Amino acid sequence: MNGTLGIAFSGLAAETRRIDASASNVANARVTGALPGKGGVTEGRAPYVPVAATQGDVRTGDGQGAGVRSGVKPLSSPIVAEYDPSSSDANSQGMVGVPNVDYGAEVSQQILGSRAYSANLSVVRTTDEMTRDLLNMRT
């Protein structure tokens, strides 16, 4: 049962990371900054770069599933240009960099993460109950 708990706990950690990444994207969706110039260099304050949670499976030496590995990575097109000539970060054309956050996708990620977290928590509870029942049978 230890393997079961390890898999469930890695799932809990992965879903926590997914929800954290999405919440960070929503919280920082309007943190604008200067657009990158030539060579990708930003002069001035850089805008928030939205991230996505990544997950990959972990396997034992014999190919058995052993949980998930999670991380975060920047979105493939994290910044979009927006016209805001009043911003101190605006370039000569009045454009600033804005995080490319899709609120609908973020809500979906948060719901998915919450449901998956609950499912992993159910595995932990069930494993705990089964272990308790097994110990009670032995006494």
Model-identified regions with their sequence ranges:
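Amphipathic alpha-helical polymerization modules
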Residues: M1-T139
